[in-house]
């Protein structure tokens, strides 16, 4: 296979990584040789499944020091995805009250989202899980309420005796839950998704004036957006939270 493929089309794969800086460019100001950093990569460059990798300083930060390299390397992509949805797309403030529903609370992104919400906001966190082990998992992460995603979500939320969630963060199978989300979300709420539903009819959300938000953590580096440095900033804060034992 390799013999018959063009070298011009070859790509080195790999996203999440921890590494030690061995060389810096002339315009780099935030890091020095010897720094241990973590990051999630860039779609426009070769990936981390290699001994050496060139990475833009705006999308990396110093890694947390209280966990192993292997443990740290498992976090950047899910942490960036969760952070950007919660604080960039939804723009949740630290003092805001209300509730949020996370569909897929036991998954990688959902697990980080729960912890970020408990560490940095006052929102009541409702997470979905169905098996006993996943229910226990999301509870251990700090979810205030756990509901079964295989059952009627709206009915379960109503039995909790709390207001309809203003935010719904759907991490998977969004097309399965669309009709339920329309019913359970608060008027003028926000729906965020990270998966790729085959069909997605947004018209039912019009009556409630719901805003729809997609999140792809590679967008900033892919388009070299003016706020690309935000990923360095958020990874720095995530590392601080890890070292503080809050993630």
Regions of interest found by a model, annotated:
Residues 37, 100, 168:
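Receiver (REC) domain switch-region micro-motif
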Residues 204-247:
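C-terminal substrate-binding/catalytic core of Rossmann-like NAD(P)-dependent dehydrogenases/reductases
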Residues 40-104:
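NAD(P)H dinucleotide-binding glycine-rich loop of Rossmann-like/cofactor-binding domains
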Residues 48-49, 130-137, 199-202:
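Short, glycine/polar-rich helix-capping loops at beta-to-alpha or helix-loop-helix junctions
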Residues 75-151:
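Mid-domain Rossmann-like dinucleotide-binding core that forms the NAD(H)/NADP(H) cofactor-binding site
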Residues 2-44:
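Glycine-rich beta-strand-centered segment in the early N-terminal region that forms part
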Residues 93-95, 141, 145-215:
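Glycine-rich cofactor phosphate-binding loops and adjacent beta1-alpha1 units
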Residues 30-33, 96-97, 187:
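Short, flexible surface segments
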């Amino acid at each position: 296979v390799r013999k018959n493929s063009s070298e011009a089309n070859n790509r080195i794969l790999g996203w999440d990584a921890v590494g030690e800086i061995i060389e810096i460019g002339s315009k780099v100001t935030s890091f020095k040789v010897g720094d241990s950093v973590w990051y999630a990569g860039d779609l426009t460059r070769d990936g981390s499944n290699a001994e050496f990798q060139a990475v833009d300083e705006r999308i990396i930060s110093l890694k947390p020091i209280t966990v192993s390299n292997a443990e740290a390397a498992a976090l950047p992509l899910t942490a960036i995805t969760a952070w950007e949805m919660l604080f960039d797309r939804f723009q949740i403030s630290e003092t805001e009250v209300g509730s949020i529903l996370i569909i897929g609370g036991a998954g990688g992104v959902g697990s980080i989202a729960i912890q970020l919400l408990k560490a940095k906001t006052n929102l009541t966190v409702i997470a979905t899980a169905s098996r006993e082990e996943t229910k226990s998992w999301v509870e251990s992460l700090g979810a205030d309420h756990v509901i079964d995603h295989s059952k009627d979500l709206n009915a379960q939320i109503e039995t909790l005796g709390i207001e309809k969630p203003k935010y719904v963060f759907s991490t998977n199978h969004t097309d399965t839950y669309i009709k339920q989300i329309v019913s359970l979300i608060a008027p003028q709420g926000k729906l965020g998704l990270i998966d790729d539903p085959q069909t997605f009819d947004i018209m039912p959300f019009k009556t409630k004036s719901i805003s729809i938000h997609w999140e792809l953590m590679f967008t900033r580096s892919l388009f070299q957006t003016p706020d690309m440095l935000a990923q360095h900033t958020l990874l720095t804060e995530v590392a601080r939270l890890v070292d503080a034992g809050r993630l």
